[in-house]
């Protein structure tokens, strides 16, 4: 469970948007980078979006989850936590670094690959 995502969901419930930043420093140039963002849309808060470094990775719309993109183990962790917190269902996601392959599995069958 990714505590950062849980905290962002709680904040987004109150504010509509919640962001978490990371701080990267290379060659003496500090840079403030948005790591995660959770956005709530709709009058009843029906549509939720999860962004990781500016890329849309998952959406929950009216209780139906959609995995949009993934390419790392941190994407697997954040997407699983995001969907589990909002729907109560934990999706089966896998990242294989040796193959550079991200898969979404439902009912034992691969439904998406990135």
Annotate the PLM regions.
Residues 1-114:
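Terminal leader/tail segments of proteins
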